[in-house]
Structures are given as C-alpha cells and as structure tokens.
Amino acid sequence: MPERERTSPQYESFHELYKNYTTKELTQKAKTLKLTNYSKLNKKELVLAIMEAQMEKDGNYYMEGILDDIQPDGYGFLRTVNYSKGEKDIYISASQIRRFEIKRGDKVTGKVRKPKDNEKYYGLLQVDFVNDHNAEEVKKRPHFQALTPLYPDERIKLETETQNYSTRIMDLVTPIGLGQRGLIVAPPKAGKTSLLKEIANAISTDKPDAKLFILLVGERPEEVTDLERSVEAAEVVHSTFDEPPEHHVKVAELLLERAKRLVEIGEDVIILMDSITRLARAYNLVIPPSGRTLSGGLDPASLHKPKAFFGAARNIEAGGSLTILATALVDTGSRMDDMIYEEFKGTGNMELHLDRKLSERRIFPAIDIGRSSTRKEELLISKSELDTLWQLRNLFTDSTDFTERFIRKLKRSKNNEDFFKQLQKSAEESTKTGRPII
C-alpha cells in the first residue's frame, strides 16, 4: 500500500527524537525552546516536553500513538511512549474509531488539543494517518486471521561482515526467511544478547525496508540502553524485570497487535524477543488459576497466550510477513523454565541452540551446530549449498572439538561462499587421502 505524501507539519516523532539525539543534545534543544525544569526530566520525559514545546510554538499539536485499551463504550487511548500507559496518552472517540475502522495496535497520527482543566488526557481532534497511510485507504485491509500462511521462501541474508561469525554460522546452519518462527535456546552466559544484536544489525542491513522491533521482557535496564544504542534501525520495546508481570503482558500483547496491523497492509515485520520464557512466567502469575499444575509450578493454561504470540509468525501468501525470533532460557536451575522450553520445543520452524560447554571454553559463537536446524531450508538456499550442508551434517560428531575446528576453518575464509569452496575442495581431497574434511 503506497504511502501518501503528508500534508501535516513535519515534526520528528518520539521514536526519531529518542533514537537520533543524545541526552546532551536534547538538553540543548530544551534550552533553545526555553523550557523550565528540564534538568529534572529523564530522557523520555525530555523528548515529550520538547515535542510539546515545538508544537505549541507553531500553534499546532500533531501527535501519534498506538491504539490500546478500547473501552466497552467504544472510545480508546493512544499510547505515546513504549506501548505503555502514561500521562501523555491521547483520548480517541468512539466515532473516530468506528469511522476509520481503527483497531488495537494501529498507529494513529492527527491533530490534538491539550487537556482542559478538568481533563487528564490530550484529545484527538482529527485522524490524518493510520500506520502512516491515508486513513481512508486502511479501511480496505483484510483481517490478520484471514491471511493464508506459507513456509518462508524469501531469505534474510545474515552474513554482512567477515568477522561476524555468529551470523555467518546461522546463514550456513539455520538460514532464516521472512515469516520465520525461530527459537534461540540459550543457557546463561552463552552470548544470547550479543547474538541478538548481531542478528538485528544484519537484518537492518539486508532488509532495510522491514519494520524491526526488539521486545525485551524481564531484562535489565542497562541491556535496554545497550540495545537502543547498538541497533539504530530497531524500535526497542521493553518491560524490565522491576515492572509487574501485568506490565510485561500488556506491552507484549500491544506490540503483537501493532505487528499484525502492519502485516495486514503488506509490511514485512520482524520481532526479536528476549525472552519467551519470561513472558510465559508473567502469564503464569497473571491468569486466573486453572486448578492444574505442571512440574515447577507452571499452570498449563498460562501457556496459551505465549504460544499465540509465538504462533503469530508467518509468511503471508498475498504479501507481507511476521518474523519472530525468540529466546528460550534453559539450564537456569528453574524447573519451570525447562518446562516452558519443553512446551515450545517443536512449535517453531527454526531452532538455534547455544552450548554452555562451548562458552565455558571461551569458544564463541557458542552455537551447537548439530542440534540447530531450519525446517524447509530448501526453500531458502540453493541446491549446491544444501548438498554441502548435508555433507557437513553427516560429518558432525557430538563434540566441542568439532565445533571448534569448524569455527577455525570458517575464520580462515573471507565469506561463506569462500567457505563452501574450501569445504568442497577438502571433500575432494578427503576421497583421495582419507583425511577429514574438517
């Protein structure tokens, strides 16, 4: 669906201001706009104050937010910051929602007015754009559940630089495509956060037009900052470990609805999630008890919503896709975490396993080549690559030494194409001399 040229004033969005400016630069902007008490504000509050001051200066108030919390009476609220409830939320009337057939998760842009004396929220005066498209055009979109899912058939090339060995190995062993539903199985301290950063940067290089989100559930605040600074092309949505489980659930559900609305208009959406385990733990605390309990204190009813989140990933026949790569935590010492992984095992069409033994020996990337694979990989890679890959898998021995030799050989090649040539050459020599390929 082509984007219409905007006719409203061009203000930088919250996401653009937050990503493109440091706190020092924002403070300078605040000084220029003659804001008061800006030194007491954190970065997010500072961005909102600057946006408000810029619009007030021009006599216009144009804001955007994600529709959430549609009430029984039909009205709703647009969330302006991090998909969470806040004081800068915007009220949208039931008539506007009905007229433009706006659904939960839609990004709505339009003219707003400041709250009056007895009001708490901004009020939306007119709807200009829905998901950055003409609001009238978006009314014609199909429903997500009516779209036909297919296996991924358009590859996401993760190999970008010679030194990025993690993504190079993924390209060889677990190729991914648009619409992939992948599980990254990770024990503690195996390098999952570094891997997610490398995957995110590789995706933004290969698929710059795709909408990339990173969802952090129950992670540390410093990891949020690290990812926001490391992956400029991604929108980082987070609910840190100090937030209540209800907040984890609300943020994850709203982001999923946002992704679905984009897929409905033909967009390619990618969500990197850390972690599905902590989301399942949050649901286990939030849902009413079913009276049944699995090992580790896990209520089986709590797994329905996390599985629905993960299961939403799909390649769409008519165009558009939703890719979800989620981490699952294992070997944490918690029986519940192991049970959650067991329930999710086999639900994806790609699994990448990280190995604690490799990480303890300081062998990085700590990828367990033998246990990692992609379903229907023949739709993503050429026949010659597939033949070489199967030849490699046949040689695999369940030992860290094999993986170490594999990584050493990979590091001696300029790129994966060169690596395949070296393998084929080694295979020919092996038939003559009997020496191992790796």
Which residues make up each language-model segment?
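Glycine-rich phosphate-binding P-loop
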Residues: P175-L196, G218
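Phosphate-interacting basic helix/loop segments used at nucleotide- and nucleic-acid interfaces
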Residues: G59-M63, Y165-I169, L255-E257, F309
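Residue-level signature of catalytic and energy-coupling elements of molecular machines
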Residues: L26, L46, G76, S93, ...
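N-terminal "pre-motor" subdomain/linker immediately upstream of P-loop NTPase catalytic cores
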Residues: S39, E45-V138
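P-loop NTPase catalytic core
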Residues: A190-G191, I199-I438
